[in-house]
Regions:
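Cysteine-centric segments in proteins
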Residues: 1-18, 23-84
Length: 84
């Protein structure tokens, strides 16, 4: 498991099928899939609905922040990602 993070959040790759995002006391596991070819990882953004802890809806603003932070960290480490 690779862990990346800065500025109050952490992004972890969870095997070949997920990205764990942690921010303060909240966390969410985002469905993803490792690929071969020009794209390394596809992340299923539409499935991002609820924080795991605490169980609360993720707002539109939080979704965009999560997307920006995950993209920034993974691309910084050389991964080519696609959001679906």
């Amino acid at each position: 498991m690779a862990i990346f993070g800065s500025k109050g959040y952490k992004v972890s790759l969870r095997g070949r099928s997920g990205v764990l995002y942690k921010e303060d006391d909240r966390r969410v596991l985002i469905d993803a899939e490792m690929l071969t070819g020009s794209t390394n990882l596809v992340i299923y953004f539409d499935r991002l609905k609820l924080w795991e802890e605490p169980r609360k809806l993720i707002t539109r603003e939080e979704r965009e922040k999560i997307r920006e932070n995950v993209t920034s960290e993974l691309e910084k480490h050389g991964l080519v990602i696609e959001w679906d």
